[in-house]
C-alpha cells in the first residue's frame, strides 16, 4: 500500500526529491498539483476554518494513495477553467436555487484570475496565487465579515462547484475559512444571504452571559427556541418561551414559533431572552414590567403638537425616517389616513400590491405621529413590512431616501388602487393628432388602470418627443410621472491628489492636488503636475499603488475616469518615456519592491517568509551599468535619503559572519530563479493586477552571476527577480527574465532595523496646491429644470426603434411638462455614476420657499384665470449629509396645522427658521400647489381628504375621471 506524499513547508517530498533546487524555497511550482498535495493543502485550510473537521480533512488527504500510487493531476487549460467558472450549469451563470451554497471571493483576486485565464498564457506572471479573502474580514480571530460589503465592488459570488474548482486549482490562503452562504427564498425573489442575522441568546436569570448564534432570515422562531434550549442545556421536560428585547428596551413575546426570523422582525445584535417555567407553574416574566412596544411611560401623559414626533433610528434607517417625515407632512395624504378614508379603498387582491399591508403599516405610523401623545415612535413594524416586500431594504445597511420614497409611493398606490381589475390598454402614438387630444387620451388610459389617492396627489404628465436622425420621423407620447429627477449642472473639472516621487534622492516625495478635466487622459494629469514641478511630462510615469505593490501602471492615453478618488496615485520622475523597441534608449526603467524577511510557522515547520513594506519605486538604470552590482549601487543611491551606508568598521565586523552565512545558505542568483525561501506575502490585500505592463527591457545583461557575490564587502540587502505580485514562487529561467521585470530588495530584520530609517522613508512634503479648494458656484432650481427639459441624444446602450426606418436609432429626445400634480416632488440628482467612478455633487441649489413658478416650463395651454395652478410652495425637504457610501439623512418639514417649520433628525425634533432650510444637503424637495393649499385651508377642505372619492370629495385632476 502506497504512502501519501509528505509535505515540508507546503512542498511535496516526492516532488522535492525530484527537484532538489526547489526544495530550498519550500513551495510547489504552479504546474505541480498532484492530488495528494492538493488535498493536503485543502486539509490544512480546513483545520484553520473548522478544527472539528481537522481529522477528517487530513484523513482525506492521506487516503488518496491508500490503494494505489498517487496520480499527478495537471491544472486544466485556461479556456477550460474559464468555461467551468463563468459558464454552464456549475458556473456563475447558474440560477439561484433555495438552499444551495454559494461562496464569496474577494473581487481583486477574482479580477486577477480573470486577467490570467483570459491572457492565454499559463506561465504568465499574472498567476493569481492562492485565493485570499483577507480584505473581506473584520478580524482574523472570529472571521466576521466587514459591514457594508457590496457585491461587484468588494466580492463576487460563486456557486459551490465553481468554488471547489478554484480551491482545487489554486488553494485557499492558509488559515482562512471559506465564506459560505445559503440561497434563501424571499417574497418574489431568491437571494444569497450574505449577512445572516446574529442573535444574542441569554437566559432570564443570567443576562450577562450570552451566546451569539447566526440564523437565516428564513429560519423559524421554533429553530431559535430549539437552539437556545440546546445551548443552555435545558431538560426536555422543562417549558420555555422566548422574548425579544427591542431598541427601546421593551420586551416582545415571540408567540408564534412557526413564523420566520424575517417575519418576527428580528435583527442582528438583538437580545433574545429565554425564560423557563418555575416549579410552582408560574413564569418569571409575570414579575417583570413589560413596556408597550411604541410608547414609553413618560409618553402616556404627554400632550404635544400633532406631527411633531421623531422616529427612532433602528440602525442606519435614517434614510427611511427622512422619507417618512416628508410624506407625513403632505397635508391631504395625512388627512386621508387620519380620517380612515383608506379603509374603504384597501385593495387586497391586487397582484402588483402588497395585500394592503404597506398601507396599513403606514396608516398606523401616521396615526401615532399625529396623535400628539408621542415625542418619538419606533417604526419597527413598518421597517419589517418594507423589508418583507422589498428585499433590497432588508437588514440595516445605508440606502437612498429617494429610492425608499419611490417604493413607498408605488406600494401605497397599488395597495389603495380603486381599480380592482386592470383592463388591457393599447398605447397609441400621436400620429399627427393635436397634443391636447393625445394628452387627454393618455391620462384617461392611465386612470383606467391606476386610480388612487397617490395618483390624485402626486401624478403628473410628461410630453416625450423623439426625432429620428435619419428619416426625421417624430414620435410624440404622453407618460405619467410621480416625481421629477432633475440633473445638476456638472463641472467638467475634478480634483486629484497625487504623490510625486522625484529622481533626486535628496528630495522627499511631494503631495500635489491637481485640477484636471473629468474626461481627460493620463497625459493631462502629467501636464498639470508639470506646471507645479517644472518636470517635463515626458519624464513622468503614473502608477496606482496598493498594498505596497504596483496595482496598475498607466499609459498616457488611458482615461482619467479609470482613476477612483480613493486610489493612491504615485507619479515617478524617470529619465524618459519607455519605448517598446529594445535598445532605443540608454536607460532602463525597473520597478522595485521592498521586502523584509520575517519568521513564520506552518504547523510543525518553521520558515522565513517575505513581507512587502514601504512604497515601491520606478528606478532608471543606465544600460551600461545594468549588472547586479551596478543595480545594487544605483539602488543604494536612490535609497540614500533613508538608508545609511555602512562604514568600514561595520564591514569588518560583518565579514566573518557573512562568510559563515554564505557557506550555510549559498543564495543562488536571480537569473537561475533561486530564492532562499519565498512563500506568499502574509499581509492583507488583493493580488496585484498590473493590467498594462510597460515593456521594461530587462535583458539577460544581468548575466548568471550570483548576487550577492562572494566577497568581503558588507551588503545591506539582496536582490531578487519577482513577478508583479512581489513574489517569486515559481522557477525563473534566464529566458523568463523578460516576463518577470520586477526587482525585490530583500532585507534581513537586523539589517533593516540598523540601516533603514522608516520615519524618514515615509516622510513627504505638501505642495502649496494641497490647500486648494475648487469653488463651486450655486445654481438655481430653475436651471436644473431647464437642464431636465433640454434636448439630448440617446446613448448607444439605449437606442430607439424607429417605426419608419425599421431600425434602432440614436434619436434626439426632449421631455416637456404637460400637467403638474398637487404635490410636486423634485429629486436633485446629486449622485453621479460612471463606469469607473461614483461621486456626490455638493453643489448649492437655490430653491424658493414660496412662489416657485412653473408657468414657463408647462407647455399645455394655460388657464390664465387661475395662475395658482402653476405656483408652488415648499412643504418639506429631505437632506443628505456625507458621501457616497455613508452619510446621514434628516428632514425639514412645515407642520400643516401650525405652519411652523421643524427639523427632524431621527428621534430629535426642533423648530427652525425658514432661512435655515436652504443648504448643500438638500436632496428631495416637496412642493404643494397653491390652489390646493388654499382649498385645504377652507372650512370645507379642512374636514377630510379632498383627493379621495371615499371621503365624498371629487378628485382634483384637470381631466375627467374615467372608471
UniProtKB/Swiss-Prot annotation:
TM spans (from-to): none
Biased composition (Basic and acidic residues): 65-75
Residues covered by the DUSP domain: 76-184
Biased composition (Polar residues): 717-731
Residue span, USP domain: 309-930
Top-level taxon of the source organism: Eukaryota
Function comment: Protease that can remove conjugated ubiquitin from target proteins and polyubiquitin chains. Inhibits the degradation of target proteins by the proteasome. Cleaves preferentially 'Lys-6' and 'Lys-63'-linked ubiquitin chains. Has lower activity with 'Lys-11' and 'Lys-33'-linked ubiquitin chains, and extremely low activity with 'Lys-27', 'Lys-29' and 'Lys-48'-linked ubiquitin chains (in vitro). Plays a role in the regulation of pathways leading to NF-kappa-B activation. Plays a role in the regulation of DNA repair after double-stranded DNA breaks.
Name this polypeptide is given: Ubiquitin carboxyl-terminal hydrolase 11
Amino acid at each position: 500500500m502506497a504512502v501519501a506524499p509528505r509535505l515540508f513547508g507546503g512542498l511535496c517530498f516526492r516532488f522535492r526529491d525530484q527537484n532538489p533546487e526547489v526544495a530550498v524555497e519550500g513551495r510547489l511550482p504552479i504546474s505541480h498539483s498532484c492530488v495528494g498535495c492538493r488535498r493536503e493543502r485543502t486539509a490544512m485550510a480546513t483545520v484553520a476554518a473548522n478544527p472539528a473537521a481537522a481529522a477528517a480533512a487530513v484523513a482525506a488527504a492521506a487516503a488518496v494513495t491508500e490503494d494505489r500510487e498517487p496520480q499527478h493531476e495537471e491544472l486544466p487549460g485556461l479556456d477550460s477553467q474559464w468555461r467551468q467558472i463563468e459558464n454552464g450549469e456549475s458556473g456563475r451563470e447558474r440560477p439561484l436555487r433555495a438552499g444551495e451554497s454559494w461562496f464569496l471571493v474577494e473581487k481583486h483576486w477574482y479580477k486577477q484570475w480573470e486577467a490570467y485565464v483570459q491572457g492565454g498564457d499559463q506561465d504568465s506572471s499574472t498567476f493569481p496565487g492562492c485565493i485570499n479573502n483577507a480584505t473581506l474580514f473584520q478580524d482574523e480571530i472570529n472571521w466576521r465579515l466587514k459591514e457594508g460589503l457590496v457585491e461587484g465592488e468588494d466580492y463576487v459570488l460563486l456557486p459551490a462547484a465553481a468554488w471547489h474548482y478554484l480551491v482545487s486549482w489554486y488553494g485557499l490562503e492558509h488559515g482562512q475559512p471559506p465564506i459560505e452562504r445559503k440561497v434563501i427564498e424571499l417574497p418574489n425573489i431568491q437571494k444569497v444571504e450574505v449577512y445572516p442575522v446574529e442573535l444574542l441568546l441569554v437566559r432570564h436569570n443570567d443576562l450577562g452571559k450570552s451566546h451569539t448564534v447566526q440564523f437565516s432570515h428564513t429560519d423559524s422562531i421554533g429553530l431559535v427556541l430549539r437552539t437556545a434550549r440546546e445551548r443552555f442545556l435545558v431538560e426536555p421536560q422543562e417549558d420555555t418561551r422566548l422574548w425579544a428585547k427591542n431598541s427601546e428596551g421593551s420586551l416582545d413575546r415571540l408567540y408564534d414559533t412557526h413564523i420566520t426570523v424575517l417575519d418576527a422582525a428580528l435583527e442582528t445584535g438583538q437580545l433574545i431572552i429565554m425564560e423557563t417555567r418555575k416549579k410552582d407553574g408560574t413564569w418569571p416574566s409575570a414579575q417583570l414590567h413589560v413596556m408597550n412596544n411604541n410608547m414609553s411611560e413618560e409618553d402616556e401623559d404627554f400632550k404635544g403638537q400633532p406631527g411633531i414626533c421623531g422616529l427612532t433610528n433602528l440602525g442606519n434607517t435614517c434614510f427611511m425616517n427622512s422619507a417618512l417625515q416628508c410624506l407625513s407632512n403632505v397635508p391631504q395624504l395625512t388627512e386621508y389616513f387620519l380620517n380612515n378614508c383608506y379603509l374603504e379603498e384597501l385593495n387586497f387582491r391586487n397582484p402588483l400590491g402588497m395585500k394592503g399591508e404597506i398601507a396599513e403599516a403606514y396608516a398606523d405610523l401616521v396615526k401615532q405621529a399625529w396623535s400628539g401623545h408621542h415625542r418619538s415612535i419606533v417604526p419597527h413594524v413598518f421597517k419589517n413590512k418594507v423589508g418583507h416586500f422589498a428585499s433590497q431594504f432588508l437588514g440595516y445597511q445605508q440606502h437612498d431616501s429617494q429610492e425608499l420614497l419611490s417604493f413607498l409611493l408605488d406600494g401605497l398606490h397599488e395597495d389603495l388602487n380603486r381599480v380592482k381589475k386592470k383592463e388591457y390598454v393599447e398605447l397609441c402614438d400621436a400620429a399627427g393628432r393635436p397634443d391636447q387630444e393625445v394628452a387627454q387620451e393618455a391620462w384617461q388610459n392611465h386612470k383606467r388602470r391606476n386610480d388612487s389617492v397617490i395618483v390624485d396627489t402626486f401624478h403628473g404628465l410628461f410630453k416625450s418627443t423623439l426625432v429620428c436622425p435619419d428619416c426625421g420621423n417624430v414620435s410624440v407620447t404622453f407618460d405619467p410621472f410621480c416625481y421629477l429627477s432633475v440633473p445638476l449642472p456638472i463641472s467638467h473639472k475634478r480634483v486629484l491628489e497625487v504623490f510625486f516621487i522625484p529622481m533626486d534622492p535628496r528630495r522627499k516625495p511631494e503631495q500635489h492636488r491637481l485640477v484636471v478635466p473629468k474626461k481627460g487622459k493620463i497625459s493631462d494629469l502629467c501636464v498639470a503636475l508639470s506646471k507645479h514641478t517644472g518636470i517635463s511630462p515626458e519624464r513622468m510615469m503614473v502608477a496606482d499603488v496598493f498594498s505596497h505593490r504596483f496595482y496598475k501602471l498607466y499609459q498616457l492615453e488611458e482615461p482619467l475616469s479609470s482613476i477612483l478618488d480613493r486610489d493612491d496615485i504615485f507619479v515617478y520622475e524617470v529619465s524618459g518615456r519607455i519605448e517598446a523597441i529594445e535598445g532605443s534608449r540608454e536607460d532602463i526603467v525597473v520597478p522595485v519592491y521592498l521586502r523584509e524577511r520575517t519568521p513564520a510557522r506552518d504547523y510543525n515547520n518553521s520558515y522565513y517568509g517575505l513581507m512587502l513594506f514601504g512604497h515601491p519605486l520606478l528606478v532608471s538604470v543606465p544600460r551600461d551599468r545594468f549588472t547586479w552590482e551596478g543595480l545594487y549601487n544605483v539602488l543604494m543611491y536612490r535609497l540614500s535619503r533613508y538608508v545609511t551606508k555602512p562604514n568600514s568598521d561595520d564591514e569588518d565586523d560583518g565579514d566573518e559572519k557573512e562568510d559563515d552565512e554564505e557557506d550555510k545558505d549559498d543564495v543562488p542568483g536571480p537569473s537561475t530563479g533561486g530564492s532562499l525561501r519565498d512563500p506568499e506575502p502574509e499581509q492583507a490585500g488583493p493580488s496585484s493586477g498590473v493590467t498594462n505592463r510597460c515593456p521594461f527591457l530587462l535583458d539577460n545583461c544581468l548575466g548568471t552571476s550570483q548576487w550577492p557575490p562572494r566577497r568581503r564587502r558588507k551588503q545591506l540587502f539582496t536582490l531578487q527577480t519577482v513577478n508583479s505580485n512581489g513574489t517569486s514562487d515559481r522557477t525563473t529561467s534566464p529566458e523568463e527574465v523578460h516576463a518577470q521585470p520586477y526587482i525585490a530588495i530583500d532585507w534581513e530584520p537586523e539589517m533593516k532595523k540598523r540601516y533603514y530609517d522608516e520615519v524618514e522613508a515615509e516622510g513627504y512634503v505638501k505642495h502649496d496646491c494641497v490647500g486648494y479648494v475648487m469653488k463651486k458656484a450655486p445654481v438655481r432650481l430653475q436651471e436644473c429644470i431647464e437642464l431636465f427639459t433640454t434636448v439630448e441624444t440617446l446613448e448607444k446602450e439605449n437606442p430607439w426603434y424607429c417605426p419608419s426606418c425599421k431600425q434602432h436609432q440614436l434619436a434626439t429626445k426632449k421631455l416637456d411638462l404637460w400637467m403638474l400634480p398637487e404635490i410636486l416632488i423634485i429629486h436633485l440628482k446629486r449622485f453621479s455614476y460612471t463606469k469607473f467612478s461614483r461621486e456626490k455633487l455638493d453643489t448649492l441649489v437655490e430653491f424658493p420657499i414660496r412662489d416657485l413658478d412653473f408657468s414657463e416650463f408647462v407647455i399645455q395651454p394655460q388657464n390664465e384665470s387661475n395662475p395658482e395652478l402653476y405656483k408652488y410652495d415648499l412643504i418639506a425637504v429631505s437632506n443628505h449629509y456625507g458621501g457616497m457610501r455613508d452619510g446621514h439623512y434628516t428632514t425639514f418639514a412645515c407642520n400643516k396645522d401650525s405652519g411652523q417649520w421643524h427639523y427632524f433628525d431621527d428621534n430629535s425634533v426642533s423648530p427652525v427658521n425658514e432661512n435655515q432650510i436652504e443648504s448643500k444637503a438638500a436632496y428631495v424637495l416637496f412642493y404643494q400647489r397653491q390652489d390646493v393649499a388654499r382649498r385645504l385651508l377652507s372650512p370645507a377642505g379642512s374636514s377630510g381628504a379632498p383627493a379621495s372619492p371615499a371621503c365624498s370629495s371629487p378628485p382634483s385632476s384637470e381631466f375627467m375621471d374615467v372608471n
